[in-house]
Amino acid sequence: MPANATRKQIIDTADALFYAQGYAQTSFADIAAAVKISRGNFYYHFKTKDEILDAVIDKRLADREAMLASWDETAEDPAKRIACFIRIVIVNKAKIMAYGCPVGTLTSELAKLDHASKEKANQIMALFRDWLDRQFRELGCGSKSEDHALRVLGWSQGVATLAQAFKNEAYVQREVAEVLEWLNTVAEEVGPRRDA
């Protein structure tokens, strides 16, 4: 396998293991065994677990940037783009019910560990906040945009946490429906109704 392909496989595998097991609970040996490479080959690509973590955070950030960019391209107005973000808890509900939100769980774990990469991981939350803020501004919410963005972001993290704890799909569906209705109300306040 070419070196770049091996490196990518290590990052993808570490990403999945960090999500399912947590960063602290995942060892070099776990990742090497899952990738089926020797430790020597592993060390050729990454000397420390922190180097792998930084690569995983970079991957998650790039993946989320691509997701948001695709919504920017495919959803015709900001309310529909915000609705895409809201519905992500349904789209990913099986994984969320099993492991929680991949962004929220990682930022929380790194904060508890007071890990040097916690600020880098927080960039993903900041990406979501800033993107949502832009969508609400484009919708016409003005000075309320950041508050609305944080409300949606906080809501998504809360639903992900409770979905993981209680494994209740009906709850997730109800919460999504309620926050979409709230979004429609916000959109009505600034212009004609646009069902999200």
Model-derived features: where do they sit?
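Hydrophobic alpha-helical connector segments
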Residues: 55, 69-99, 149-152
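Short, basic, alpha-helical segments at the C-terminal edge of helix-turn-helix-like DNA-binding modules
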Residues: 58-65
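Helix-turn-helix
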Residues: 6-9, 13-51, 55
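Amphipathic alpha-helical segments used for helix-helix packing
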Residues: 81, 95-116
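Hydrophobic/aromatic-rich alpha-helical bundle segments in the mid-to-C-terminal region
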Residues: 103, 115-126, 137-196
